[in-house]
Amino acid sequence: MKAKATTRQGRRRFLQVSGVATAALMIEGLPFTARAANSGKIKIGIVGSGRVGGGIGSVWVKAGHEVMFSSRHIEHDKALAAKLGANAHAGTPREAAAFGEVVMISVPYGALPEVGKNLEALIKDKIVIDTCNPFVWRDGEIATWARKKGAGLASVELLPGARIVRAFNAIGAARMSTAHQDPGRIGMPIASDDAEAIVVASNLISDIGYDPILIGDLEMGKYLMPGTPLSGEHTPEEIRKIVATLD
């Protein structure tokens, strides 16, 4: 009986989420959304240009977006930008945060407090794609806290003022920039409380070959990390079925 009740609750949550997604994708008159739709190009600042940030950012450049890469190793970022061409740039994390209409943060979770403090004024009111996952073995106590609180809600506290979308969290880093090339569509589960941010992030995800699937608000972001039912590569329909079972 309890299992059936949980399933019904999950289905109700999924129907609510589906309604939010539909409403979000029908939004009109939002200045940034309209501008992005008209030009087809967005300036993206990437903070953390490792396997996820560097890989996804490279695919965005190839899709026609203008991207600035940043990390602790500027020479790495300069070499990456030079290889990608005129739409790719290298800078410091602060320069990337200032450059981007959208900012993607892809750093170890243990670095988020420092990143949030250093970039707070630059990412305030900006759409921030949060790819960071808390691993206790790597990030220590802050990962324990984030996993207990839920990674989405924890990131809100660590990146105050940002309009957060959790995405690119469930698929392994080694496959992140290539999984979309395989036959069949792969879904990309996302979570956010911000309707406009959902639209913009969904378009960027679609641009690189994934199907964006909104699973809910940032509280549901706790499921967007390795080790949860949503981890790994799933079709859009598989993601929807999994979400319907979550409580």
Each language-model region and where it sits:
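Internal alpha-helical scaffold of NAD(P)-dependent oxidoreductase catalytic cores
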Residues: 91, 158-164, 182-221, 225-226, ...
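N-terminal secretory signal peptides and thylakoid transit peptides that target proteins
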Residues: 1-22
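Rossmann-fold NAD(P)-binding glycine/threonine-rich loop
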Residues: 132-165, 174
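Nucleotide donor/acceptor-binding cores
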Residues: 42-44, 126, 184-186
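Rossmann-like NAD(P)-binding element
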Residues: 85-87, 92-127, 134-138
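C-terminal segment of N-terminal export signals and the immediately downstream linker at the start
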Residues: 29-63, 68, 72-77, 87
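Short, well-ordered coil/turn residues at beta-beta hairpins
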Residues: 17, 106-107, 131, 167
